[in-house]
Each structure stands twice: as C-alpha cells, then as structure tokens.
Amino acid sequence: HYQIGSIMVRILSFTDRPIDRTFWHERLKAAYDMRLALHLANSDTTNAYRLVHGEGDNLPGLIIDIYRNTAVMQAHSPGMHYARHLLAEALKEVMGDKLDNIYYKSETTLPYKAALEQENEYLLGGVGEDTATENGLTFHVDWLRGQKTGFFVDQRENRALLERYSRGRKVLNMFCYTGGFSVYSMRGGANLVHSVDSSAKAVELVNKNIELNFPGDSRHQAFAADAFRFLDEMTTEYDLVVLDPPAFAKHRDALKQALRGYTKLNAKAMEKMPKGSILFTFSCSQAVNKDQFRTAIFSAAMQAGRHIRILHQLHQPADHPINIYHPEGEYLKGLVVYVE
C-alpha cells in the first residue's frame, strides 16, 4: 500500500489476508456500526457525519462523509484510489437503501508525485448538491464545488456549544465558509450576527443557509473581506467572536510561521472585544499541537493587553476517532476563552 510523500507506508492489516471486497466490507461495516452506536447514522436530527476517518477507522488514506443519502469519498493515497470501485460496492452493501449516491472527490487530495490523472466522478448515482441536517438545522451542501467534501462536519459539537453562549450577544464569525457557526448563533438568540469570508462564493453560501433556516431575519449580514483588514477596520463591539481559519501549517516546516499567524490573528480580535466577551478560537493544523496552540493564544492576550481565562478546551467529535498509534489523527483543537 505504497504512498508517495511524507508517509512511507500505510498499514491495512497485521495479518496475512487478501485485501479484497470482503476486507473492505468488514472495515466499512465496523465504521458504520460505530456511527450507529454514536446515534449519528440513525439520528432524527442529524444526517451529516463522518463515516470513515482514515487511520481512526483502520482505513488509512480514506475519508468518507455522509450527507443524507450521499457519500463523498476522498482518497489520500494511491492504494485507496485503486480500490475505489471495490470500496463503493462494499459501501453500498453496508448502507443499503440509505445510500443513493457516491461521489469520488480526490483530484486535489492524491499525492501529486503519484502522477495519477484522476477526475472527480460519481461511482454511484449522480445528484449534484443537496441539503443536510445537523442538530435540526438545514444546510446546503455542494460537494462538487465546495471545499473538502462540501461541509465541515468536524465542528458539529462546537457549533452547538456556541449556540448556548449566543443569546443577547453580537456575534462575529470570521472565515465563515458555509456559515455553520452563524446559523447556530441565530438560533441561540444572538442580537446581531456578522459573517466574514474572503470568498464571495462563501458569502453567498452563508446567506443562503441563513435564509434557509431564518427567512427574512434581518439580524444577519455577511461581508466578503480579508480577515486581518476587517479586524483592523471594524468598529462594532462584538462580544462573541469565532476564529476558525484554514490550516496555517500543513507541514512542520511552516510551524513557526503558523504560530505567529495564530498569535497575530487572535491578538487583533482581542484588542477590539469589550470586557466580558467570549472568544471561540480554533486550529485545524496537524502540525500545531494543543500546547503550542494554547501558548499562541496566551501570547495573543499578552500582546493585546487582555486577561483571559479558558472556559472550554475543544476538539473533534466522536465520528472523527483517533487511532492510538496515529496521534496525528487528532488535528482539530480549539479554546473558548473569557476575555477581560
């Protein structure tokens, strides 16, 4: 199972057995059974979740996210790419009539050195986009043109936590993308919600999701703007801020630069936040560990001249399990801090 890149080898099994359709069926069924145990695959309020989280589900190099009756599959290694058709057949067997579409989206995730000329394609069905439900809220999911698999299911529990703190607050959601945090804060009773993203398409999408859940609600406004410039120029005193940027460090070589970026970003936000504010801040960079991220946030508070206290230490949800032999699978870390 050869991988061209920084990972020398990915291990599928420690026993001598054929890697065939039966093997894939067993692994996918184990992953599905766990999501049933987590009350995700059989939930009345959520139908967007991660079915396969690479090494965490003993399927290294494979990601599968479920959106209602569609599976979006990403291969991160040539081995999983070559097995895609067997995987699709096994997945349909496991999920049965709960699955109508399988979209294979690996153009940008396969190692470029592998020289695999792969176009994204349907392995089953062919629906272009759909809506998915998360904790009773509805979101447009466009796996054809959207980032990653179309939606960030890893923030589900953290969005629900934000909802609890939203009542009566002025919320700023930076790097909003689909606007998940914005939609939850609207339901939580925020007085005002502003969503910011550098992408005009993201702004269009967050507005679409707000209208889908809260038609005609004037509390929300979205802006297409550079994050640092927006923070420099903003005059509204937001007392609940979400900073969920894209990965600042995808490789260890970029670690120092990434930590400086997190410090700068969080310091700019803290400088403008009134006393008694709450900051949700995240890093999805594998190369940045929890201690390094926390140190960057403490440094940001010092630069901003603010005193902060940690209210919550956040991470990825249970449908993103971590293999004890693959600690890198724990990539999402976050802090909720009280700013004084």
Q: Which residues make up each language-model segment?
A:
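Mobile active-site "lid"/loop adjacent to the S-adenosyl-L-methionine
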Residues: 224, 238-268
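Conserved SAM-binding motif I beta-strand of class I
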Residues: 192-197
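Non-catalytic substrate-recognition/targeting regions of SAM-dependent transferases
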Residues: 52-65, 81-152
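Non-catalytic accessory regions of SAM-dependent methyltransferases
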Residues: 1-68
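Conserved SAM-binding loop of SAM-dependent methyltransferases across substrates and taxa
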Residues: 178-191
